[in-house]
């Protein structure tokens, strides 16, 4: 990963979108640190939309529709859940600066959620940023078995349907690799990003 570059809390939503367009994304050291820094990995996580695959057991569970899937229904609740410290995630990079910035992106149509609901309870979800024909996945959470996985399946279906060309996962994890995520060298990623940025901003 390239060295972090410190940025003041005075960052604006416009600057944030510009950063995405040139391959940068923000993180914070912790939820209590008001500053953010820019990250530009040497290897970028990408989930090819034409090579997305799921296990037979997950496909069967998706068909059973265990949750109601909603898009862009409750952004604040989703990002708050993603920022929660849990036993499996004792710290978070989502600070208040990031939460405020992405709430504004949501208001202007550049941040989106996929949400899994069980009745009136939010049990899983993810959020990310859309720009051109790219979707930049930011974070996800799950309070029920497979809830975030099912949200990811619906995200990919949505992106394919709308004509998106790039699903950026920032980094790869063993979990994401089971869906087909790959590490893409920075130079190759720049080419994929350039194509996506040449596209008009697609409606999510």
Swiss-Prot record:
It is an enzyme of class 2 (transferase). It catalyses: N-terminal L-lysyl-[protein] + L-leucyl-tRNA(Leu) = N-terminal L-leucyl-L-lysyl-[protein] + tRNA(Leu) + H(+); N-terminal L-arginyl-[protein] + L-leucyl-tRNA(Leu) = N-terminal L-leucyl-L-arginyl-[protein] + tRNA(Leu) + H(+); L-phenylalanyl-tRNA(Phe) + an N-terminal L-alpha-aminoacyl-[protein] = an N-terminal L-phenylalanyl-L-alpha-aminoacyl-[protein] + tRNA(Phe). It is found in: Cytoplasm. Keywords: Acyltransferase, Cytoplasm, Transferase. Its EC number is 2.3.2.6. One of its GO terms (molecular function) is leucyl-tRNA--protein transferase activity. Its main location: cytoplasm. NCBIfam families: aat (TIGR00667). Functions in the N-end rule pathway of protein degradation where it conjugates Leu, Phe and, less efficiently, Met from aminoacyl-tRNAs to the N-termini of proteins containing an N-terminal arginine or lysine. Belongs to the L/F-transferase family. This is Leucyl/phenylalanyl-tRNA--protein transferase. The gene is aat.
């Amino acid at each position: 990963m390239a060295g972090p570059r410190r940025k003041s809390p005075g960052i604006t939503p416009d600057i944030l979108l510009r950063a995405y367009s040139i391959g940068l994304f923000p993180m914070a050291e912790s939820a209590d640190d008001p500053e953010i820094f820019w990250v530009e990995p040497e290897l970028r996580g990408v989930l090819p939309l034409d090579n997305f695959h799921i296990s037979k057991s997950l496909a069967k569970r998706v068909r059973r529709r265990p949750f109601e899937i909603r898009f862009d229904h409750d952004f604040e609740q989703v990002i708050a859940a993603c920022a929660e410290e849990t036993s499996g995630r004792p710290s978070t990079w989502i600070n208040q600066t990031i939460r405020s910035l992405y709430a504004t992106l949501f208001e202007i149509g550049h941040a989106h959620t996929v949400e899994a609901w069980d009745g009136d309870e939010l049990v899983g979800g993810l959020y990310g940023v859309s720009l051109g024909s790219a979707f930049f996945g930011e974070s996800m959470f799950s309070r029920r078995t497979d809830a975030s996985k099912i949200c990811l399946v619906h995200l990919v279906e949505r992106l394919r349907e709308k004509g998106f060309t790039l699903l950026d996962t920032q980094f790869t994890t063993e979990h994401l690799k089971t869906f087909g995520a790959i590490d893409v060298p920075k130079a190759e990623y720049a080419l994929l990003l350039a194509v996506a940025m040449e596209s008009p901003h697609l409606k999510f």
